[in-house]
Amino acid sequence: MGEMEQLKQEAEQLKKQIADARKACADITLAELVSGLEVVGRVQMRTRRTLRGHLAKIYAMHWATDSKLLVSASQDGKLIVWDTYTTNKVHAIPLRSSWVMTCAYAPSGNFVACGGLDNMCSIYSLKSREGNVKVSRELSAHTGYLSCCRFLDDNNIVTSSGDTTCALWDIETGQQKTVFVGHTGDCMSLAVSPDYKLFISGACDASAKLWDVREGTCRQTFTGHESDINAICFFPNGEAICTGSDDASCRLFDLRADQELTAYSHESIICGITSVAFSLSGRLLFAGYDDFNCNVWDSLKCERVGVLSGHDNRVSCLGVTADGMAVATGSWDSFLKIWN
């Protein structure tokens, strides 16, 4: 038996010991805990607005903290900031590269960012003195595509990349402050904790990792998926995370219990998940799928309680407003829909 084989066996034994130790700490399952709860009634949501203006597939969207404006990025090479109350376009920003994969709205509302196959994160100032929108920074150091970006504040942004790393940037200097190394596959998505001190990443190595922004270290790793993790989000209280994967399941992991609590899947669902988001209370989980639908799950009872159908192509992105009053879905059919 080669040295490599021996080490592999040792690693597997250690993994098993860790799994057993976690199980020993689990005093109750989620199913047992919520056995007395009724399933949420049928969730029926209507399309309240359809945002028309993109001319090609929409790849990403992100709500502003005011729950009114949102930014979307499309293969047509445009970044559009929408007023969702009126469906008007507040800004239509032409991009230098049309191969965009992600976009983000700064918490302050002063900036938006985007990036993709150009390996860069471009920051746009919405509040320039001249009134026009212009590139204020181009952050380039990643050696792979930019899959996701999220602002911490007006001067700090976190990015995830196909080069397997995540990075924290100082926007003012354009430099990487910290590089987060640990994934062994393309990093596909990230989400920032409600207190902005931690972030989570999901990758093609089928694992999710929790990172400490200030320390630059990986605090926890969550495994269980059988394929790429495409989407990830925090539970509203910041104490659990949800992942969506190409294995057709979403999974809920508890940070304090350090393990998976449950999975959301159904034998009739055989396609991958592109996006995930919780309702404000956390009771509902919205998940966008390759089959053109967005399924609504009761996060505690793990049952499907609704479906948002109306798109004519893959639902590529979705998001719930900060005030919890609406959910937006974006699709390869070039439209965004606002539901409640």
Swiss-Prot record:
Family listed: Belongs to the WD repeat G protein beta family.
Quaternary structure and interacting proteins, as annotated: G proteins are composed of 3 units, alpha, beta and gamma. Interacts with RASD2.
Gene: Gnb3
Mapped WD repeat ranges: 53-83, 95-125, 141-170, 182-212, 224-254, 268-298, 310-340
Tissue: Expressed at a high level in the heart and at a much lower level in the brain.
Keywords attached to this entry: Repeat, Transducer, WD repeat
Any Pfam family the entry gives: WD40_Gbeta
GO CC annotations on file: cell body; cytoplasm; dendrite; heterotrimeric G-protein complex
GO molecular function, one term: signaling receptor complex adaptor activity
Summary of the function given for this chain in its UniProt record: Guanine nucleotide-binding proteins (G proteins) are involved as a modulator or transducer in various transmembrane signaling systems. The beta and gamma chains are required for the GTPase activity, for replacement of GDP by GTP, and for G protein-effector interaction.
Protein name: Guanine nucleotide-binding protein G(I)/G(S)/G(T) subunit beta-3
One GO process term, biological-process aspect: regulation of fat cell differentiation
Gene3D superfamilies the UniProt entry points to: YVTN repeat-like/Quinoprotein amine dehydrogenase
Record InterPro entries: G-protein_beta_WD-40_rep, Gprotein_B, Guanine_nucleotide-bd_bsu, WD40/YVTN_repeat-like_dom_sf, WD40_repeat_CS, WD40_repeat_dom_sf, WD40_rpt
